[in-house]
From Swiss-Prot:
Domain PABC: 541-618
Subunit and partners: Interacts with ybx1; interaction recruits pabpc1a on C5-methylcytosine (m5C)-containing mRNAs, preventing their degradation.
Record-linked Pfam families: MLLE (PF00658), RRM_1 (PF00076)
Domain of life: Eukaryota
Family: Belongs to the polyadenylate-binding protein type-1 family.
Matching PANTHER family: RNA BINDING PROTEIN
Primary subcellular site in the record, as a coarse category: cytoplasm
Keyword Acyltransferase attributed: no
Gene name of the encoded protein: pabpc1a
Keywords noted in UniProt: Cytoplasm, mRNA processing, Protein biosynthesis, Repeat, RNA-binding, Translation regulation
Protein name: Polyadenylate-binding protein 1A
Any GO MF annotation of the entry: poly(U) RNA binding
Length: 634
C-alpha cells in the first residue's frame, strides 16, 4: 500500500486545539449536523481526568466525516478555533515526515486558517498548525500534505516569498535528531566568538586590538545599553574557523583589565539552554544514583516534629547522613526525608517505622522517588487495576466499578454481551442488598449513596474526603460485599456475641488490641464498654492486626475495616453512618486502624466528614436553584 495515499474507512476525525472545558456533549452538538455519529471521546489524563486538548469523532459514513472536515475546520468552540484532520492510527505514517514542511518567520497575525488557505493551493492538506504559546504565535508552523509532490511544489514556490510583508522560509521538515546533528557539525566549524567578563571600560577599538592578532575579523562588537555603557560582553566574528579556534584556545581564562575573561564559541539562546538543561539533568541523575536506596520519604508527620526529633526517631536503625522536615513559612508541610549511609539501614527503617505512631500520627515511610518515577508507578498501578476491571464479565458485580467512561457513545454502537455499563437508578435499587455490617432490623438511611470506597494504591496522597457521588454510580463497597458473599457464602455469626446495636449479622467480629502495631508502647487494655470502645469484641476471636489485614485479599481489606467502623459511627450519627463510613474508607488502612484504637481520633475524623457533608448539601441546594443547560438527547 502506498503510504502517501492513505484511506480512511473508519470515518474517524481528530479534533485538536480544544479548550480544556470542551466536553463530549459540546462536540456532539457541533458535529451532529454533519451526519450520524457513532461515538465521541475527549482524551483525558488518566490521573487528573483533565482534558488533553484533543478528541476523536467517529461518524457512521465516511462522506459525513469528509463533510465535517471541509465545513467545520477552524470553527470556534469556546473561544478557540479547532483543528480537524483525519485520524491516523499508525504512528509511523504520522512521524515519517513524508509531505511535511516547516515554515518560519511568520507574521504574528497569521493563524492556522490563514496558513491553511495559503498552502491549500498546492495540494490536499492533512494537518496545518501555527505553533503558539500564551503570548500568541511563535512565528513558525507546519503544513502536512497528503503527498510528497505537493510538499515539494510548496517549497519551490513559497520559499523566500512575502507573507504579510515578511520574507518566510519554507523547507522540508527535519526531526530534532537531524537538526541536532546539523548543529553539531556547524559547531565544529564555528567562526563567531563570544567574550564576557571584561569590565565596563572596554569598547570596540580596544577589543579589536586584542583579537586582531589571531586573524582577519568580519566584525567586532561590544554590547552596550541605551546610555552607551558596556554590558561586559561582546562578539568577534572571524573569517576562518582556524583563527576563531586559536583565539578561544589562547584567550579563554586570561586576565584582561584585572578580570579573568571567558572566551568561547558563540551559541544561540536555544542551543545554550539545551546544553545547560542537559548538564542539569546529568547532575540530578548523578545525585539520584548516589542516594538510590538510602533516601527515605516520610509523610504524615505531626506538626510539632522538627529535624532533630525526626533524626532521633530514625537513629536506632543506622547512621543518618541527613534528616530534614520540609517547612513553608516556618510551619511543617507534613513530610520530610531521612538519608542513611547504606541501603540495608534504610530498608530496616522502612520495615520498622512504616505505620508506627510518632507523636499522634502513624507515619508513612518509603524509599524516596523522583516525580517522574512516582507518576509512572501510579500510572502502572492504575492500568493494572483497570485491566482487572475489564476482566470481570458483568460490571454491576465488579468490586472496582470505575466512574462511567469519558467517551460519549451514541445508541448506534452495538454493545457487547454482558457489558451494560449504565443502569437506571430504579434497577440499582433492586440490585443492592443490605450491607454486611448493617444492624439487625435497621438499614442505614441513604446507604446506597455512600461515596466510593475502593482500595487505593499505597502511594503518597493527601487524606481528604471525596464529595458524595450520585446514586447512579454503583458504590464500590457495596459491590465488593456482593462479590464476597457470592464467592464464600454466608458467614455464621460467632457464638456468644453480644446482642445490641454493635452486633453484626452473619459476619464474625474481631477485637482490636490497642498498640498492636507499636509493641514498644505498652498501653493497658481498656475494659469492654459496648459502643464506647475503639474495638469490636467477639469471644474466641483473635484481635485484628496490621499483619492480618495485609494478609487479606485487597478487595476484602476495606470491607473488614468498614464492618468495624460502621457500628462505631452509627452510635455517633445514626442517619449519616453509611455515608460517613464510605468517606472514611478513602483514608489509608494504617490510619483507619489507628482510628479504631483511638476514639478521639475517630471522633475528630467523623466531625470533619459531617462538616464536608453539610457543605456538600448546601452546595447542592444552591445548584438546584440554577437551571442546568440542556444536553442533546441520545
Amino acid at each position: 500500500m502506498n503510504p502517501s495515499a492513505p484511506s480512511y474507512p473508519m470515518a474517524s476525525l481528530y479534533v485538536g486545539d480544544l479548550h480544556p472545558d470542551v466536553t463530549e456533549a459540546m462536540l456532539y452538538e457541533k458535529f451532529s449536523p454533519a451526519g450520524p455519529i457513532l461515538s465521541i471521546r475527549v482524551c483525558r489524563d488518566m490521573m487528573t481526568r483533565r482534558s488533553l486538548g484533543y478528541a476523536y469523532v467517529n461518524f457512521q459514513q465516511p462522506a459525513d466525516a469528509e463533510r465535517a472536515l471541509d465545513t467545520m475546520n477552524f470553527d470556534v468552540i469556546k473561544g478557540r478555533p479547532v483543528r480537524i484532520m483525519w485520524s491516523q492510527r499508525d504512528p509511523s505514517l504520522r512521524k515519517s515526515g513524508v509531505g511535511n514542511i516547516f515554515i518560519k518567520n511568520l507574521d504574528k497575525s497569521i493563524d492556522n486558517k490563514a496558513l491553511y488557505d495559503t498552502f491549500s493551493a498546492f495540494g490536499n492538506i492533512l494537518s496545518c498548525k501555527v505553533v503558539c504559546d500564551e503570548n500568541g504565535s511563535k512565528g513558525y508552523g507546519f503544513v502536512h500534505f497528503e503527498t510528497h509532490e505537493a510538499a515539494e511544489r510548496a517549497i519551490e514556490k513559497m520559499n523566500g516569498m512575502l507573507l504579510n510583508d515578511r520574507k518566510v522560509f519554507v523547507g522540508r521538515f527535519k526531526s530534532r535528531k537531524e537538526r541536532e546533528a546539523e548543529m553539531g557539525a556547524r559547531a565544529k566549524e564555528f567562526t563567531n566568538v563570544y567574550i564576557k567578563n571584561f569590565g565596563e571600560d572596554m569598547d570596540d577599538e580596544k577589543l579589536k586590538e586584542i583579537f586582531c592578532k589571531y586573524g582577519p575579523a568580519l566584525s567586532i562588537r561590544v554590547m552596550t545599553d541605551d546610555s552607551g555603557k558596556s554590558k561586559g560582553f561582546g562578539f568577534v566574528s572571524f573569517e576562518r574557523h582556524e583563527d576563531a579556534q586559536r583565539a578561544v584556545d589562547e584567550m579563554n581564562g586570561k586576565e584582561m583589565n584585572g578580570k579573568q575573561v571567558y572566551v568561547g564559541r558563540a551559541q544561540k539562546k536555544g542551543e545554550r539552554q539545551t546544553e545547560l538543561k542537559r548538564k542539569f539533568e546529568q547532575m540530578k541523575q548523578d545525585r539520584m544514583t548516589r542516594y538510590q536506596g538510602v533516601n527515605l520519604y516520610v509523610k504524615n508527620l505531626d506538626d510539632g516534629l522538627d529535624d532533630e526529633r525526626l533524626r532521633k526517631e530514625f537513629s536506632p536503625f543506622g547512621t543518618i547522613t541527613s534528616a530534614k522536615v520540609m517547612m513553608e513559612g516556618g510551619r511543617s508541610k507534613g513530610f520530610g526525608f531521612v538519608c542513611f549511609s547504606s541501603p540495608e539501614e534504610a530498608t530496616k527503617a522502612v520495615t520498622e517505622m512504616n505505620g508506627r505512631i510518632v507523636a499522634t500520627k502513624p507515619l508513612y515511610v518509603a524509599l524516596a522517588q523522583r516525580k517522574e518515577e512516582r507518576q509512572a508507578h501510579l500510572t502502572s498501578q492504575y492500568m493494572q487495576r483497570m485491566a482487572s476491571v475489564r476482566a470481570v464479565p458483568n460490571p454491576v458485580l465488579n468490586p472496582y466499578q470505575p466512574a462511567p467512561p469519558s467517551g460519549y457513545f451514541m445508541a448506534a454502537i452495538p454493545q457487547a454481551q454482558n457489558r451494560a455499563a449504565y443502569y437506571p437508578t430504579s434497577q440499582l435499587a433492586q440490585l443492592r442488598p443490605s450491607p454486611r455490617w448493617a444492624t439487625q432490623g435497621v438499614r442505614p438511611q441513604h446507604f446506597q449513596n455512600m461515596p466510593n470506597a475502593a482500595v487505593r494504591p499505597s502511594a503518597p496522597r493527601p487524606q481528604t474526603f471525596n464529595p458524595v457521588r450520585p446514586a447512579s454510580q454503583v458504590p464500590r463497597m457495596m459491590t465488593s460485599q456482593r462479590m464476597g458473599s457470592q464467592a464464600m457464602g454466608p458467614r455464621p455469626a460467632a457464638a456468644g456475641a453480644a446482642t445490641g446495636p454493635a452486633q453484626v449479622r452473619g459476619v464474625p467480629q474481631y477485637k482490636y488490641a490497642p498498640g498492636v502495631r507499636n509493641p514498644q508502647q505498652h498501653m493497658p487494655t481498656q475494659p469492654q464498654v459496648p459502643m464506647q470502645q475503639p474495638a469490636v469484641h467477639v469471644q474466641g476471636q483473635e484481635p485484628l492486626t496490621a499483619s492480618m489485614l495485609a494478609a487479606a485479599p485487597p478487595q476484602e481489606q476495606k470491607q473488614m475495616l468498614g464492618e468495624r467502623l460502621f457500628p462505631l459511627i452509627q452510635n455517633m450519627h445514626p442517619s449519616l453512618a453509611g455515608k460517613i463510613t464510605g468517606m472514611l474508607l478513602e483514608i489509608d488502612n494504617s490510619e483507619l486502624l489507628h482510628m479504631l484504637e483511638s476514639p478521639e481520633s475517630l471522633r475528630s475524623k467523623v466531625d470533619e466528614a459531617v462538616a464536608v457533608l453539610q457543605a456538600h448539601q448546601a452546595k447542592e441546594a444552591a445548584q438546584k436553584s440554577v437551571p442546568s443547560p440542556a444536553v442533546p438527547a441520545v
